[in-house]
Curated annotation (Swiss-Prot):
It comes from Haemonchus contortus (Barber pole worm). Residues 19-86 form a propeptide. Expression of the protease correlates with blood-feeding and suggests a role for the protease in blood digestion. Belongs to the peptidase C1 family. The lineage of its organism: Eukaryota, Metazoa, Ecdysozoa, Nematoda, Chromadorea. Its EC number is 3.4.22.-. GO terms for biological process: proteolysis. Pfam families: Peptidase_C1. Residues 1-18 form the signal peptide. SMART domains: Pept_C1. This is Cathepsin B-like cysteine proteinase 1. Keywords: Disulfide bond, Glycoprotein, Hydrolase, Protease, Signal, Thiol protease, Zymogen. It is an enzyme of class 3 (hydrolase).
Amino acid sequence: MKYLVLALCTYLCSQTGADENAAQGIPLEAQRLTGEPLVAYLRRSQNLFEVNSAPTPNFEQKIMDIKYKHQKLNLMVKEDPDPEVDIPPSYDPRDVWKNCTTFYIRDQANCGSCWAVSTAAAISDRICIASKAEKQVNISATDIMTCCRPQCGDGCEGGWPIEAWKYFIYDGVVSGGEYLTKDVCRPYPIHPCGHHGNDTYYGECRGTAPTPPCKRKCRPGVRKMYRIDKRYGKDAYIVKQSVKAIQSEILRNGPVVASFAVYEDFRHYKSGIYKHTAGELRGYHAVKMIGWGNENNTDFWLIANSWHNDWGEKGYFRIIRGTNDCGIEGTIAAGIVDTESL
């Protein structure tokens, strides 16, 4: 494996949201739109994605502060793991690894824990893939979110996915699951917000949830020992900013974690292929990138969000591929599972 060591204090460009909007050719008046004027503009200015009139509930609580765009440590950037690999025109690991039960949509609720939730989900998928579906475990986002502080970030306020991957190497992470999941060490502690079809209603959410405390023990009533329940990684890295390198990484090892700038128009995404079109910068978000495809001659990435399975395309969304839209291809975090720890 080849690596490039980039001695950078900040890996991503430090432009303001307005500068980035201008760089993408978005008119100044379109950058300032919100509400109904924004919805009307999106519907007449593009045809790649359908627009929701109503914005995503608890939107501000689901994304991170823009400061988490900037990496604080030196990064190991991995070259294309297999430059000679044949890349298929489309790829969805759910069709390949049908026995992997880890491919489902999470719900981070009113907590900016996307960095931990997406990393835990990607690790879970990679464990299943590395073991050829023999090992099925949902890695605990809670363990990462609450115990990897301050090096990973600040829990529900946000964090850095690459640091979560490093934590997986050096500290290990226990089993987890969604809210109230039984027979796991540390399930997600924050209930889903509001109504979600026929799912259990736990109540509404107000503001950003406080970060729960770090508890280095399994929940009461679970016959697991915290230290023994841990799984470990053996490598963590940023994937080279190249469509083929990202595709090769996903083909070889499984889903990765992508981070991107979130603008006002993403608040109104319903379905289709998202491309930033209008609205101001609102924050930053981390998601699990699982595959890619093409629709009507438009290349896209296939991405699992963590805003419940009634958001977007059954919890997923697609974003235009090959243009680094919103920085989606700029900081792809990944890691290798230590199969001996499974």
